[in-house]
Amino acid sequence: MQYPLPIARLIDSFMKLPGIGEKTATRLAFYAMDMPKEDVDEFAQALVDVKEKLRQCSVCGNITEQDPCAICSNPVRDRSTIMVVEEAKDVMAFENMGEYDGLYHVLHGVLSPMDGIGPEQINIKSLIVRLQKNDAAKEVILALNSTPEGESTAMYISRLIKPAGLKVTRLAAGLAVGSDIEYANLITLKRAVQGRTEL
C-alpha cells in the first residue's frame, strides 16, 4: 500500500536526517500528523529559523545569531588560548563542561582525501590568518575527534602553525579512539583538557 503523497514526502524528508531509517521516519510522520497544528507550525518554524537566522561567526566559525558570536565578543574570555574543534556541536560540549574559558575555532570538518575533503574545504586558512593577526594567542589546543581523519588534521595544522612559535597541544588520552567529542561525558572532557600534551 502506498501512503498519501504528503505522508510519503514527510517520510522521505525525515529519512534525510542521520540515523533515521524508514521505520522511524514513518513513525515520526504519523506522530506529526496527530500533533496539534500549532505544534506542527512551531516545529516547521524552528526548522526554517535554523536555516535563516543562524550563520557562521566571521571570527571563529561557530554558529551564531550575531556576528561576531557571543564567545568571540566576550571581553572576559582568555584570548591567549584557541581551541580548534571539528564542529559547532563540539563547542557546545566544551562550554557545557564549564572549565575552558578561552576562544574557539571551528573547522567544519576534517581532512579526508578519500572523500575529496582537503584543506580548502574546511576552515583552516581562516585559522592561520586569525593566528597571524592575533598577538595575544599563545597556545592552540587541537581538540579534534580521535579518528584517523582527526589525527591527520591535527598533525597537518600543527605543522602549519608550529613555525610561528605558538604552543600546540592535543587533548590528553581518555577519549577513546574513534569517539566523538560531543558524546564524551563532562569528567572525561575536563581531564582531556587539563592533561593535554604538547605536540
UniProtKB/Swiss-Prot annotation:
A zinc finger (C4-type) spans 57-72. Coiled coil: none annotated. Keywords: DNA damage, DNA recombination, DNA repair, Metal-binding, Zinc, Zinc-finger. GO terms for biological process: DNA recombination; DNA repair. Transmembrane segments: none annotated. The keyword Lipid metabolism does not apply. Residues 80-176 form the Toprim domain. One of its GO terms (molecular function) is zinc ion binding. May play a role in DNA repair. It seems to be involved in an RecBC-independent recombinational process of DNA repair. It may act with RecF and RecO. Belongs to the RecR family. This is Recombination protein RecR. It comes from Lactobacillus delbrueckii subsp. bulgaricus (strain ATCC 11842 / DSM 20081 / BCRC 10696 / JCM 1002 / NBRC 13953 / NCIMB 11778 / NCTC 12712 / WDCM 00102 / Lb 14). The gene is recR.
